[in-house]
C-alpha cells in the first residue's frame, strides 16, 4: 500500500522488491484505505516521499518504474545499472552527448581520450564531488562504506 506513513522507497528497497515473484499495489484515494484492511492483512506500507498526492495511482508509476527497470532484460545492458546514482551511495557523474561543443561548452577532453582507466577515474571523482556538494547525507554513507 502506497502511503506517506510507509517505509521510504529507496534503491535498496526497489532491488529487494524486484526479486519478488508477485507484488500487489493498493492505491488509496484522498484519505487512504480502511484501517481494518491494513490491520487484518499482511500489507507493507511504502512511501515515495514526504509529500501528499491525490491518489496512489501516480505514486504507483514511480514505484513500478523503480522496480521494473531492475528486472533482467528490461534495460539493454544490465551492467549499466552499476554506475547509476545510489548504487554505491554516490550520485551519478555528468552525462554528455553530441555535438562535442554546444553553446561554447565542450565535452571534457578526458571523455574523448579513449583511455578507459582515465575515464573511470574522472567519473568517480565527478560522482564524489557532486555527492559531497549536493547530498551530504549520501556522502556520509559513502565515506563509511569506503
Residue ranges of each PLM-predicted region?
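S-adenosyl-L-methionine/SAH cofactor-binding core of RNA-modifying enzymes
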Residues: 1-29
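Internal, active-site/partner-interface "lid" segment
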Residues: 58, 70-109
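Structured adenosyl-cofactor binding patch, chiefly the S-adenosyl-L-methionine
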Residues: 33, 37-84
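Short glycine- and Lys/Arg-enriched binding-loop motifs that mark or flank ligand-binding interfaces
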Residues: 24, 45, 51-52, 100, ...
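Fold-independent oxyanion-binding glycine-rich loops
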Residues: 2-5, 27-30, 49, 56, ...
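SAM-dependent methyltransferases
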Residues: 99-146
Amino acid at each position: 500500500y502506497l502511503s506517506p506513513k510507509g517505509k521510504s522507497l529507496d534503491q535498496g528497497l526497489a532491488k529487494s522488491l524486484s526479486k519478488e515473484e508477485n507484488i500487489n499495489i493498493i492505491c488509496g484515494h484522498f484519505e487512504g484505505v480502511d484501517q481494518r484492511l491494513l490491520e487484518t492483512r499482511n500489507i507493507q506500507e511504502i512511501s515515495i516521499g514526504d509529500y501528499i498526492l491525490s491518489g496512489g495511482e501516480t505514486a504507483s508509476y514511480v514505484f513500478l518504474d523503480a522496480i521494473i527497470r531492475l528486472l533482467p532484460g528490461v534495460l539493454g545492458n544490465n551492467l549499466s545499472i552499476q554506475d547509476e546514482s545510489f548504487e554505491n551511495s554516490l550520485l551519478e557523474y555528468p552525462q554528455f552527448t553530441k555535438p562535442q561543443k554546444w553553446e561554447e561548452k565542450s565535452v571534457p577532453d578526458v571523455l574523448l581520450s579513449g583511455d578507459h582507466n582515465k575515464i573511470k577515474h574522472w567519473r568517480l571523482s565527478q560522482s564524489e564531488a557532486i555527492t559531497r556538494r549536493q547530498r551530504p547525507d549520501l556522502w556520509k554513507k559513502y565515506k563509511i562504506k569506503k
